[in-house]
Amino acid sequence: MLGITVLAAILACASCCGNPAFPPNLSTRVVGGEDAVPNSWPWQVSLQYLKDDTWRHTCGGSLITTSHVLTAAHCINKDFTYRVGLGKYNLTVEDEEGSVYAEVDTIYVHEKWNRLFLWNDIAIIKLAEPVELSNTIQVACIPEEGSLLPQDYPCYVTGWGRLWTNGPIAEVLQQGLQPIVSHATCSRLDWWFIKVRKTMVCAGGDGVISACNGDSGGPLNCQAEDGSWQVHGIVSFGSSSGCNVHKKPVVFTRVSAYNDWINEKIQL
């Protein structure tokens, strides 16, 4: 019963999740995106690893409880030491107002993660201590199990990834409009074909706006009818030809295919 209760609370309490104090700017059209409104995606985190006594951004992630972050399995290296930046906007400002850095307790990588085919590209990071929620740090909503969005449903990818193919990492959080691409379209021969499984979701592919290196693990944010924001995808992979290739939309791990797994891990 406890396991059912915890995830049900994340799903059902729209006022408890996915409602930023500073609403995002949705009037615009990440690569080809724009600077986000500060703290308008307050569940977005920066996953950082320690190298040469310096913390470096490697991936994004989403805070889904006060103690757990959802990210991609391919972001995790068992030999690295990680920390999680929460409430961040500008990565070049270490002591940014409203931000905190959390130590990591445990990282759960999906047991069937396949590095070759990028199947089950999902991981959960348990923080050493629960974080205190605020206007700059909030939890994201999780969609209901099996939830599928229709073709062209407007969603937003967010992150500090490269501003263009082989370009610099973004200093401030970026956002980009990424409409949903149906599985039927995304699995066409001239799109992603058999690389895309039904446990994945595609978005974008217009050749203009896209996620890029450094956005991995971050959220695909989609607004529900009640106005709350749900994380429907985790940035998984894109085209080796570049970050914004026509008919090669970003492929995300579909969160609603993993509700049971998420629920199991947040109980540990």
From Swiss-Prot:
Sequence similarity: Belongs to the peptidase S1 family. Elastase subfamily.
* CDD domains registered for this protein in UniProt: Tryp_SPc
Q: What PANTHER family does the record point to? A: CHYMOTRYPSIN-LIKE ELASTASE FAMILY MEMBER, ELASTASE 3 LIKE ISOFORM X1
- One Pfam entry for this protein is Trypsin
Annotated function: Regulates activation and degradation of trypsinogens and procarboxypeptidases by targeting specific cleavage sites within their zymogen precursors. Has chymotrypsin-type protease activity and hypocalcemic activity. Cleaves TRY4 and TRY5 and thereby inhibits their autoactivation.
Gene name of the encoded protein: Ctrc
Q: Which residues form the Peptidase S1 domain?
A: 30-267
Q: What class of enzyme is it?
A: hydrolase
SUPFAM superfamilies named in the record = Trypsin-like serine proteases (SSF50494)
At which residues is glycosylation annotated? N25, N90
All disulfide bonds of the chain are: C17-C141, C59-C75, C155-C222, C186-C202, C212-C243
Q: Does the keyword Thylakoid apply?
A: no
InterPro entries tied to this protein? Peptidase_S1_Elastase_sf, Peptidase_S1_PA, Peptidase_S1_PA_chymotrypsin, Peptidase_S1A, Trypsin_dom, TRYPSIN_HIS, TRYPSIN_SER
Give me the reactions it catalyses: Preferential cleavage: Leu-|-Xaa, Tyr-|-Xaa, Phe-|-Xaa, Met-|-Xaa, Trp-|-Xaa, Gln-|-Xaa, Asn-|-Xaa
Name this protein carries in UniProt: Chymotrypsin-C
Keywords noted in UniProt: Disulfide bond, Glycoprotein, Hydrolase, Protease, Serine protease, Signal, Zymogen
Q: Which residues form the signal peptide?
A: 1-16
Q: Does the record carry Hydrolase as a key word?
A: yes
The active-site annotation reads: H74 (charge relay system), D121 (charge relay system), S216 (charge relay system)
